[in-house]
A protein has these predicted regions:
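Hydrophobic faces of well-ordered beta-strands that scaffold small-molecule active sites
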Residues: 7-9, 36-40, 72-74, 100-104, ...
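Active-site-adjacent beta->alpha loops and helix N-cap segments on the catalytic face
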Residues: 13-34, 51-56, 76-96, 109-115, ...
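C-terminal alpha-helical cap/extension of soluble enzyme domains
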Residues: 68, 150, 154-230
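Ligand/cofactor pocket segment of small-molecule handling proteins
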Residues: 95, 99, 105-107, 117, ...
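Catalytic cores of alpha/beta
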Residues: 1-2, 46-63, 107-122, 143-154, ...
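A structural motif
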Residues: 4, 33, 68-69, 124, ...
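Catalytic domains of carbohydrate-active enzymes, especially glycoside hydrolases
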Residues: 1-14, 67-68
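Ordered, amphipathic secondary-structure segments that act as subunit-interaction surfaces
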Residues: 59-75
């Protein structure tokens, strides 16, 4: 089986991802030794958090670290759209030196380059970004600027995400030969086995698809890896 180099583990992909369960991480650990960075996001919505939410996420980091997480994916913003470095300190301390990725809060921050530099100052080794756009192709110019910062100033790797597939990896690699890290859900939808369905009684947001389960597609992962290695 051709696997990814690293796994970002999260729950609730339909809302952009939330903190996963330690039990799920432990199950993964029994089956694979792939490095796992866990997303830490206690709720859906924006990335400005209360002190109680920060305390909760620091506790989630400690719990997941004890369950086998090798790194964490975190991020907080101030109301003005800057990286909230002060609020992130408790989470960074809870990680106890584990590698850190800044998640896509950068894409809704006021200044992507400033946010990248702030992440560098905090010790992050990776920044996940779509270039401040709804998908990576639309954010290509901004991603190019961030890759330039990485190469000229040294600092966090640029992990390109949002809409990544094998075709786009090849496209990015042609335009930016230095693009070397890509983040993809590589998901497919599995039809629910439920025969009796009540479409008029949603369990979540109205209109949310509740009759499919998202699952990683092995062939998509393989094609992405092949495109990266070309």
């Amino acid at each position: 089986m051709i696997m990814a180099d690293r796994l970002e583990l999260c729950s609730a992909l339909t809302v952009g991802g939330l903190t996963p369960y330690p039990e799920l991480l432990r199950q993964i650990r029994t089956e694979s030794d792939i490095p796992v960075r866990c997303l830490i996001r206690c709720r859906a919505g924006d990335f400005h958090y209360t002190p109680d939410e920060i305390e909760l996420m620091a506790a989630q980091i400690r719990n997941l670290k004890s369950a086998g997480a090798t790194g964490f994916v975190i991020g907080c913003l101030t109301p003005n759209g800057d990286l909230d470095t002060e609020s992130m300190i408790p989470m960074i301390e809870a990680a106890e030196g584990a590698p850190l990725t800044l998640h896509r809060c950068i894409d809704v921050s006021r200044d992507l380059c400033k946010t990248w530099r702030d992440a560098k100052a905090l010790g992050f080794d990776t920044v996940l970004t779509s270039g401040g756009a709804s998908d990576c192709e639309k954010g290509m110019d901004a991603i190019g600027q961030l890759l330039y910062l990485r190469d000229t100033e040294g600092g966090p790797e640029i992990l390109i995400g949002a809409g990544v597939n094998a075709k786009r990896i090849s496209f990015f690699r042609t335009r930016f030969p230095g693009a070397r890290a890509f983040h993809a859900s590589a998901k497919t939808l599995i039809e629910s086995k439920m025969l009796f369905r009540r479409d008029d009684v949603p369990m979540g947001l109205p209109g949310l698809d509740e009759w499919h389960v998202q699952q990683t597609d092995e062939s998509s992962v393989r094609l992405c890896k092949e495109a990266l290695n070309q």
